[in-house]
C-alpha cells in the first residue's frame, strides 16, 4: 500500500555530456482503503518508524499522507491469530475511521481529523445510529473467540532484547534453520517486512529508469556484494530475520517488536517454521 511491490523512482536521460534526472513521485490523489484489520493497521506504525525517520523516504511519505484508512473490527479471527500478544485490540483498528459490519449494517466511527473530514463529505449517506449494542455484542464475541484460539496465551519474552549476544549465539538457530527452505514466503506475506532492491533498466538510447522492488533477507543473494556475501549460509540469514524482528528492531524502537501477530507466516510456511516457534524455542533454551 505505502510500500508497493514495485515502484518507479527516477528517470535518467543522457544527451552528450548532459545528464538530466526526473523524480517520479506517487499521485497526490487521495486514496481511501476500506476494511483494514487491526493487525495491519498496527503494521503501518512499524513501517512509519522505518520510512519516516531521517532520512525520510519521500515515496512512502507521499502515499501515507494521501491515504485515508478505514478499519474494520474483526468478527472471525483466524486460528493462527495472536495480535493480542502485542496489545492490539482486534475489534478496534488504529485507523482514521473504525467500522463494524453487523448483520448487513455498517457501523461507522470517525477517529482522526482525516476521518472526520471524510465523514463530513459523505453527508447524507450516513445516519446517526440509535443503538450500538450490536457492535458491543460482536466485540465481546470476538474476544471470546480470541480467548480460546491455540495461541490465546502466547506472549513474547521481554528478556530477549536485553540478552542480544546470548540470543545471537544460541544453539536454537542450529536446530531450527536446517528445516527452512529459503522460499521467502514468510517475508512476502509479512506486513512489517520492508527489505527492497534497487534496479536500473535501459529503456532506450541514453534513457534509464530506476525501480524499487521487494526483496527478501532470506534470499541467498540478498547481501551479496562485489567482495562476497557476509551471510552465505541459510542459518545466518534465518537468524538475521528473527533477530531483526525480536531484538534489533525493539532495541531501536522503544521495545516494539517488528511483528503484529497477523498469523500469515504460520499459515503459509510450507514446513511450519514461523516466528512463534522461534520465540518459544528461544524462551525455553538454556543458553539464552
Q: Residue spans of the language-model regions?
A:
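Short alpha-helical basic/polar micro-motif
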Residues: 37, 184, 188, 267
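Basic (Lys/Arg-enriched) interaction patch that binds polyanionic ligands
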Residues: 178-198
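Ferredoxin-type iron-sulfur electron-transfer modules in oxidoreductases and energy-metabolism complexes
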Residues: 156-178, 196-288
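Iron-sulfur-associated redox domains of electron-transfer enzymes in respiratory
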Residues: 1-163
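Hydrophobic positions within alpha-helical membrane elements
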Residues: 42-43, 189, 268-269
Amino acid at each position: 500500500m505505502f510500500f508497493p511491490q514495485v515502484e518507479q523512482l527516477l528517470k535518467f536521460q543522457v544527451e552528450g555530456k548532459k545528464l538530466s534526472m526526473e523524480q517520479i513521485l506517487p499521485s497526490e490523489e487521495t486514496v481511501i482503503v476500506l476494511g483494514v484489520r487491526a493487525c495491519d493497521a498496527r503494521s503501518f506504525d512499524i513501517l512509519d518508524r522505518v520510512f519516516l525517520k531521517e532520512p525520510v523516504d519521500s515515496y512512502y511519505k507521499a502515499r501515507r499522507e494521501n491515504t485515508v484508512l478505514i478499519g474494520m473490527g474483526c468478527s472471525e479471527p483466524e486460528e493462527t491469530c495472536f495480535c493480542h500478544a502485542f496489545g492490539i485490540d482486534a475489534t478496534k483498528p488504529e485507523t482514521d475511521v473504525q467500522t463494524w459490519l453487523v448483520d448487513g449494517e455498517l457501523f461507522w466511527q470517525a477517529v482522526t481529523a482525516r476521518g472526520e473530514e471524510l465523514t463530513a463529505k459523505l453527508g447524507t449517506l450516513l445516519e446517526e445510529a440509535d443503538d450500538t449494542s450490536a457492535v458491543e455484542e460482536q466485540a465481546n464475541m470476538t474476544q471470546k473467540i480470541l480467548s480460546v484460539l491455540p495461541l490465546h496465551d502466547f506472549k513474547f519474552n521481554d528478556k530477549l532484547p536485553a540478552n542480544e549476544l546470548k540470543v545471537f549465539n544460541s544453539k536454537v538457530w542450529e536446530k531450527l534453520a536446517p528445516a527452512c527452505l529459503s522460499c521467502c514466503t514468510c517475508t512476502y506475506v509479512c506486513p512489517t517486512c520492508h527489505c527492497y532492491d534497487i534496479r536500473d533498466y535501459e529503456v532506450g538510447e541514453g534513457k534509464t529508469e530506476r525501480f524499487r522492488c521487494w526483496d527478501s533477507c532470506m534470499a541467498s543473494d540478498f547481501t551479496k556484494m562485489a567482495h562476497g556475501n557476509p551471510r552465505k549460509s541459510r542459518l545466518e540469514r534465518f537468524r538475521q530475520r528473527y533477530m531483526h524482528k525480536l531484538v534489533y528492531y525493539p532495541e531501536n524502537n522503544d521495545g516494539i517488536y517488528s511483528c503484529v501477530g497477523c498469523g500469515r507466516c504460520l499459515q503459509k510456511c510450507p514446513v511450519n517454521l514461523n516466528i512463534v516457534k522461534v520465540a518459544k524455542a528461544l524462551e525455553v533454551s538454556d543458553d539464552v
